[in-house]
């Protein structure tokens, strides 16, 4: 599209492919025409060209914008739904204060992604009926679909107390049943509340929620209720996202940006590991590049913009790696594959024979930085018929 702003990336794995969606704006965050883009990949490295899955639409003569806290849902029957939230241009707060509680969203929209790559119709799965009349919504409600399978998938999503917590700042509490420990935070002028949830299950059954603004809480009943929201002083992410998950080796991993309050930078991307999901240590650095290519408003520099991995409960992926997608300075969308177990150093001198590997992904003890315009590949030389590493720029 030629846009220079890309943000809010989301990741899932379905039908043997990775899927990523993100929002795109011409120059500034949520200014001008906005679209939601979708890409897919069979290996996580080579990606399709972006397609517009949620378009910019006009509603009653007024442009609409869209962004999201969640991007995908895979139903029990195997349907893949993409998701975003729409709001009218007139409800976009001034650039100096764009917190989501200041926007009067139409609601949360979904769209089915079919196995052949085509898209279904766009429907609202949750809408703010207290803010808008029925004829003011740009899309129909999901119950108007003629596909019983889609309706069942939407109702399954609506009943999921953990996933729908992504919506709580976009759907007014009177329209949806959210825990008071969250909704009580919505007060005038408060930007530092819990939003953009990431969660994982501990071995004792507790659900650990990690939110933007270094907030956390526990649930012992699958999101029906929560403990009081507290500040995590050691996860000093400032006004940025935190990602946490359980890894295939039975450990836990969390990613955050270490720069605290008052810093505009979102770098480096740190990860720490934990045996119990409570105490994290061994901080390691995955991506510390600070790339800025274009001008634009609300563009924090660095790779810690909306890092998101694969949520619990999805299909099994090939291998045991951790995958994380993120926005570099809210411009380019990156994805990292982190081998499990997560380690910060090699215990011995690295001796890997290029002749014994098929591709760059087979290197176990290397950190490979592989942008599209400066690729790193393994190839066979013509002269000596052996494998070498080729760096292109």
Region roles according to the model:
Residues 17-21, 78-82, 204-208, 250-254, ...:
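Entry beta-strands of beta-propeller and related beta-repeat scaffolds
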Residues 7-10, 66-72, 196-198, 240-243, ...:
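Beta-propeller and closely related beta-sheet repeat lectin domains
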Residues 236-287:
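Loop/turn-rich, solvent-exposed surfaces of beta-rich toroidal or solenoidal domains
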């Amino acid at each position: 599209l030629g846009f220079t702003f890309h943000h809010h990336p989301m990741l899932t794995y379905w039908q043997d492919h990775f899927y990523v969606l993100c929002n795109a704006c011409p120059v500034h965050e949520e200014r001008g025409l906005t679209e939601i883009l979708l890409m897919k990949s069979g290996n996580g490295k080579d990606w399709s060209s972006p397609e517009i899955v949620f378009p910019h639409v006009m509603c009653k003569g007024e442009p609409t914008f869209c962004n999201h806290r969640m991007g995908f849902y895979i139903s029990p029957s195997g349907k893949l739904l993409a998701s975003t939230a729409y709001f009218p241009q007139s409800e976009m707060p001034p650039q100096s204060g764009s917190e989501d509680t200041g926007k009067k969203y139409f609601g949360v929209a979904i769209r089915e992604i079919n196995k052949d790559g085509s898209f279904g119709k766009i429907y609202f799965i949750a809408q703010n009926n207290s803010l808008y009349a029925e004829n003011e919504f740009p899309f129909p409600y999901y119950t108007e679909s003629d596909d019983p399978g889609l309706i069942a998938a939407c109702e399954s999503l609506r009943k999921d107390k953990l996933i729908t917590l992504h919506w709580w700042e976009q759907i007014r509490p009177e329209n949806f049943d959210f825990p008071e420990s969250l909704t009580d935070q919505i007060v005038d002028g408060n930007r530092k509340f819990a939003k953009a949830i990431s969660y994982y299950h501990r071995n004792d059954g507790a659900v650990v929620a990690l939110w933007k603004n270094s907030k956390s809480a526990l649930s012992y009943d699958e999101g029906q209720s929560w403990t009081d929201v507290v500040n995590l002083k050691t996860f000093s992410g400032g006004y940025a996202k935190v990602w946490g998950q359980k890894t295939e080796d039975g450990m836990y991993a969390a990613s955050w940006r270490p720069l605290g309050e008052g810093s505009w930078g979102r770098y480096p991307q740190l990860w720490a590991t934990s045996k119990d999901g409570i105490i994290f240590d061994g901080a390691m650095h995955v991506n510390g590049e600070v790339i800025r290519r274009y001008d634009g408003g609300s563009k924090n520099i660095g790779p810690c913009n909306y890092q998101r991995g694969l949520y619990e409960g999805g299909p099994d992926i090939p291998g045991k790696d951790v995958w994380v997608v993120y926005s570099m300075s809210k411009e380019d969308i990156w994805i990292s594959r982190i081998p499990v177990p997560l380690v910060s150093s090699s215990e011995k001198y690295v001796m890997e024979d290029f002749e014994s590997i098929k591709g760059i992904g087979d290197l176990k003890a290397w950190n490979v930085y592989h942008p599209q315009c400066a690729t790193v590949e393994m190839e066979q030389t013509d002269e000596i018929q052996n494998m070498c590493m080729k760096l292109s720029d």
